[in-house]
Design a protein with these regions (language model features):
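C-terminal active-site-proximal or functional interface alpha/beta core segments in diverse enzymes
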Residues: 78-179
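Conserved alpha/beta-domain cores
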Residues: 1-118
Length: 179
């Protein structure tokens, strides 16, 4: 299928790429929790920033190429500050990996979660992204940045109607089960 780069967030997943090291590379996914996100994806996915250097060392010992870092602060994020924080931490990790000779991390995936209006008001996307663009300037020269703006692009295109068949409260928030 031509897919050559995959995302991992733990040593067990990284080890799975050892047999495919000649054909595939990985991004290390970091966790930056944002409890203000409608869906806090870093609760489920990503390693702590402190785990990056040990993961890079493991990748080197396995012969697995690490192309860069990845994070996704959540879905429907109202404020850009968690992106700014995450980019700053990633910039430091990229510099550290380069300075130590562990890896040339040339790619940063900043995820998605860019907000859309669901009947309420949100910042215009240019305003929302202004501090993110500023933070990206702190990245080492030559780092390529990609994003995953799925909701922002596809969200306004349709409406889904479902029947709620159940609900549960978890960590102070309601979860609804649909048909």
């Amino acid at each position: 299928f031509g897919i050559r780069t995959f995302v991992v967030d733990n040593p067990d997943e990284l080890r799975k790429f050892h047999p495919h090291r000649a054909r595939a590379a990985v991004l290390l996914r970091l966790s930056f929790r944002d409890p203000t996100a409608v869906v806090d994806l870093s609760r489920k996915f990503g390693c702590e920033p402190a785990a990056v250097v040990p993961m890079l060392e493991l990748a080197r010992s396995l012969g697995v190429k690490v192309r860069g870092l990845s994070f996704h602060v959540g879905s429907q994020v109202a404020e850009p500050k968690k992106y700014v924080e995450a980019i700053g931490v990633c910039a430091e990790l990229i510099e550290q990996a380069s300075a130590s000779g562990l890896a040339n991390l040339a790619l940063l995936d900043i995820g998605g979660g860019f907000p859309i209006a669901y009947g309420g008001t949100i910042q215009p996307i240019r305003e929302f992204c202004r501090p993110i663009r500023q933070a990206l300037k702190t990245l080492p020269r030559g780092v390529r940045v990609i994003a995953e703006p799925g909701r922002f692009i596809a969200g306004p295109s349709g409406t889904s109607i479902s029947t709620v068949v159940g609900r549960a409260q978890r960590e102070g928030r309601w979860w609804y089960y649909l048909d």
